[in-house]
Amino acid sequence: MRSSYSEEDVILLLKDITGMVEPQPAKVREKLIQSGKHYSEMLPVEYVPTDQYMQVYHNALKHYAKPVANAVGMLADKIIENKGKKIVLVSLARAGIPIGILVKRYIKFKYGINVPHYSISIIRGRGIDDNAMKYLLEKYRPQQILSVSYTHLRAHETRSNL
């Protein structure tokens, strides 16, 4: 499956639908959703970010890189402290992947451990991907599997600012 992420950072446990579903613009998808089609049966058109978007991104990066790095470090340290070194990170596809990658990289940098990081899908109204969970549970003990998300990061960032 084609991805902008390196397999060294994350293994996507997603069904490859390349060539099976044609990406559609947001307005078309919204009309289809209103007519009863489920959003998970469609793909968005992936646009190249505009210069204005990239300017906002770089500005946010400049202002928030250090607090995010501190929160990632605190979270990763707590993970190792509470779960040990034989962990498996699991993030939700799209929104959870960046946090999972940052935590994985921090653990490798500080502890010298290359922990696995997988990403799975959860679909509103349909639930978590059973096949992905089955795969993970066949390969790892339940105690090793740890879900990471932006919510975990925000909780640690908030505590560090108290």
Where are these regions (language model features)?
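Short glycine-rich phosphate-binding loop at a beta-alpha junction
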Residues: 86-92
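Long, charge-dense
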Residues: 106, 110-143
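A short, well-structured juxtamembrane/interface segment
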Residues: 67-82
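Conserved small/polar residues in nucleotide/adenosyl-binding loops
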Residues: 151-158
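Short Gly/Thr/Asp-enriched flexible loops that form oxyanion-binding sites at enzyme active sites
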Residues: 99-107
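Glycine-rich phosphate-binding "P-loop"
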Residues: 53-68
